[in-house]
């Protein structure tokens, strides 16, 4: 493992490893630790008390962050008929049906999210599943990207709705904003995420569900969080 440079070590020295920070404390500190020359993304990492090898214990859901993510989301919509106009009016970046499917199959990937109406899913599954699936872009009802309300799906993604799911180690990684956000807005986004995560707890998961949590930025050290809300020294 490569060693961290002086800058990183200096920032890490500002984090008390014997303390669990309240989200308000951590949100203020994470802004101080974001010293890169770009607006770093602020992320939270939750270790869950699940067995990710068991499909009935996997966690997946969506949440609308009240203050958005701070990034511009390019949305592609695969639909036809009157839904095309509805998607365009809602701000979709690219809209189409069969021709868009063929375009994506040919290598077009200038988007961050894909939504679709149910009538297009058979073709999408046949032609795009292997391409979009590994990238986490395949439309799915569970992630709120398949449905009849294309305008609502587009607006939700543009406004800051994110999808969360555990990885193969039972950890959920999710963005909650940018380092330029007010600390109170980061805290509010965190609270929305943790509420959604708790609501997605599988019925088969036993014991403590939220094992640990850390707040971090793109280039900064992680900050341990107190899951009970108050700081723990």
From Swiss-Prot:
HAMAP family (alphabetical): Ribosomal_uL1_B
Family: Belongs to the universal ribosomal protein uL1 family.
Organism listed in the record: Deinococcus radiodurans (strain ATCC 13939 / DSM 20539 / JCM 16871 / CCUG 27074 / LMG 4051 / NBRC 15346 / NCIMB 9279 / VKM B-1422 / R1)
One Pfam family per UniProt: Ribosomal_L1
InterPro entries in the record: Ribosom_uL1_bac-type, Ribosomal_uL1, Ribosomal_uL1-like, Ribosomal_uL1/biogenesis, Ribosomal_uL1_3-a/b-sand, Ribosomal_uL1_CS
Name assigned to this protein: Large ribosomal subunit protein uL1
GO CC list: large ribosomal subunit
Role this protein plays: Binds directly to 23S rRNA. Forms the L1 stalk. Unlike the case in the Thermus thermophilus 70S ribosome, this protein is not seen to block the exit path of the E site tRNA. It is clear that the protein in the structure is flexible however, so this is probably due to its position in these crystals.
One Gene Ontology MF term: rRNA binding
Any one GO biological process: translation
Stored PANTHER family: 54S RIBOSOMAL PROTEIN L1, MITOCHONDRIAL (PTHR36427), LARGE RIBOSOMAL SUBUNIT PROTEIN UL1M (PTHR36427:SF3)
Keyword terms: Repressor, Ribonucleoprotein, Ribosomal protein, RNA-binding, rRNA-binding, Translation regulation, tRNA-binding
Subunit structure: Part of the 50S ribosomal subunit.
């Amino acid at each position: 493992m490569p060693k961290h440079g002086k800058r990183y070590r200096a920032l890490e020295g500002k984090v008390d490893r014997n303390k669990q920070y309240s989200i308000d404390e951590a949100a203020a500190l994470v802004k101080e630790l974001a010293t890169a020359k770009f607006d770093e993304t602020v992320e939270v990492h939750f270790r869950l008390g699940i067995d990710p090898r068991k499909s009935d214990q996997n966690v997946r859901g969506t949440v609308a962050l009240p203050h958005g993510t701070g990034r511009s989301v390019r949305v592609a919509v695969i639909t036809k008929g009157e839904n095309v106009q509805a998607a365009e009016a809602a701000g979709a970046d690219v809209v189409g049906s069969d021709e868009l499917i063929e375009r994506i199959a040919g290598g077009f990937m200038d988007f961050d999210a894909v939504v679709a109406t149910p009538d297009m899913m058979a073709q999408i599954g046949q032609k795009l599943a292997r391409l979009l699936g590994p990238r986490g872009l395949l439309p799915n009802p569970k992630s709120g990207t398949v449905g009849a309300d294309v305008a609502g799906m587009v607006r939700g993604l543009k406004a800051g709705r994110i999808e969360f799911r555990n990885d193969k180690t039972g950890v959920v990684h999710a963005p909650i904003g940018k380092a330029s956000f007010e600390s109170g807005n980061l805290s509010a986004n965190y609270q929305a995420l943790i509420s959604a995560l708790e609501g997605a707890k599988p019925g088969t998961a036993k014991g403590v569900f939220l094992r640990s949590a850390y707040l971090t930025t793109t280039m900064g050290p992680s900050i341990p969080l107190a899951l009970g809300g108050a700081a723990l020294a």
